[in-house]
């Protein structure tokens, strides 16, 4: 009796399995037939054509830049034709900072790089530059940075009618971080009360004050370049100095803050009201601003006798 039941169950399930296979084969034949398109349209989901806004493929742009750089390999690798508006360098929809300010800064940096390559034999021994750099010198360097950034903020406030957007939406975090770092470094420096801002700092502050009275666009360019250059180099610079001086704690001013992004946002908004002459005046001032801010590197240029 049990044997018969098992045989019946086996036969029943085998028929079901065969029926499924037969149904699947017949369905595939039907879909391939002349009336199959009706069934396919019923079964398949609707497909919608999304006409998205055309976007810029930045990955291809980066690959193109790398390929162009490799083509310039050799002594001419840094000879870039900045007058040529390449497809990946120029976009009409971009704003003033990306269209004109950043390419100008890149051109200035490229010129400085060529000068460094010419004089690399003079600067080949880096130990000559670190011999006299002490914790007192580092504290003075931080004080110089703090006083310069503070003076820039004060000049923005004094000329509120011209720089109103920078007061409310511009940089405002870095000075607080530098102040906290000065308090900390002072605690690990002997005779820290005797350390005061350097003559280089006072000279640069005087230069900024004169510029703000004579040419506010030029002053704005100096302020932007100072913020931008410190933003790009601060993490590596401050960490390297702390490592050299055996300062264990991480400085707050070496961390990321959005001051430069806020500054560039304000520049873009201000430039909408500028004439072509005002934009060219600002761009021309970037060269002098880059050269002038290098005065603070004299802290590191004390060559041992």
Swiss-Prot record:
Q: Does the keyword Signal apply?
A: yes
- Function according to Swiss-Prot or TrEMBL: Essential for blood-stage parasite viability. Required for apicoplast biogenesis. Associates with the apicoplast genome and mediates apicoplast gene expression. Can bind heme. Can bind protoporphyrin IX.
Coiled-coil intervals: none
Q: Where is this region: Sufficient for apicoplast targeting?
A: 1-83
What start and end residues bound the annotated signal peptide?
A: 1-18
Which of UniProt's keywords are assigned here?
Answer: Apicoplast, Glycoprotein, Heme, Iron, Metal-binding, Plastid, Signal
Cellular location(s): Plastid, Apicoplast
Q: What happens when the gene is disrupted?
A: Conditional knockdown results in severe growth defects and widespread parasite death in the third intraerythrocytic growth cycle. Impaired apicoplast development.
PTM note says: Proteolytically cleaved; targeted by its N-terminal leader sequence for import into the apicoplast where it undergoes proteolytic processing, resulting in an N-terminus starting at or near Gly-33 in the mature protein.
Q: Name one GO molecular function term.
A: heme oxygenase (decyclizing) activity
Q: What is this protein called?
A: Divergent heme oxygenase-like protein
Please name the gene that encodes this protein: HO
């Amino acid at each position: 009796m049990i044997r018969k039941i098992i045989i019946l169950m086996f036969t029943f399930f085998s028929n079901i399995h065969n029926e499924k296979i037969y149904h699947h084969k017949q369905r595939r034949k039907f879909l391939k037939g002349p009336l199959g398109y009706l069934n396919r349209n019923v079964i398949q989901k609707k497909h919608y054509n999304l006409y998205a806004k055309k976007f810029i493929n930045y990955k291809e742009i980066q690959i193109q830049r790398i390929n162009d750089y490799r083509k310039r390999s050799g002594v001419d690798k840094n000879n870039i034709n900045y007058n040529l508006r390449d497809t990946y360098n120029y976009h009409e929809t971009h704003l003033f900072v990306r269209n004109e300010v950043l390419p100008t800064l890149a051109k200035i940096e490229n010129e400085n790089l060529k000068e460094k390559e010419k004089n690399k034999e003079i600067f080949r021994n880096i130990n000559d530059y670190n011999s006299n750099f002490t914790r007192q010198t580092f504290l003075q360097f931080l004080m110089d940075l703090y006083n310069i950034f503070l003076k820039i903020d004060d000049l923005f406030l004094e000329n509120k009618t011209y720089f109103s957007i920078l007061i409310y939406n511009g940089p405002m975090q870095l000075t607080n971080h530098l102040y906290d770092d000065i308090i900390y470094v002072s605690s690990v420096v002997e005779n820290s009360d005797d350390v005061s801002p350097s003559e280089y700092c006072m000279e640069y502050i005087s230069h900024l004050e004169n510029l703000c009275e004579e040419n506010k666009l030029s002053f704005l360019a100096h302020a932007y370049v100072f913020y931008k250059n410190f933003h790009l180099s601060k993490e590596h610079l401050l960490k390297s100095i702390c490592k050299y001086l055996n300062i264990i704690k991480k400085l707050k001013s070496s961390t990321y803050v959005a001051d430069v992004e806020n500054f560039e946002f304000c520049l873009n908004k201000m430039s909408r009201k500028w004439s072509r002459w005002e934009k060219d005046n600002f761009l021309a001032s970037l060269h002098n601003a880059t050269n002038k801010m290098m005065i603070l590197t004299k802290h590191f240029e004390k060559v041992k006798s």
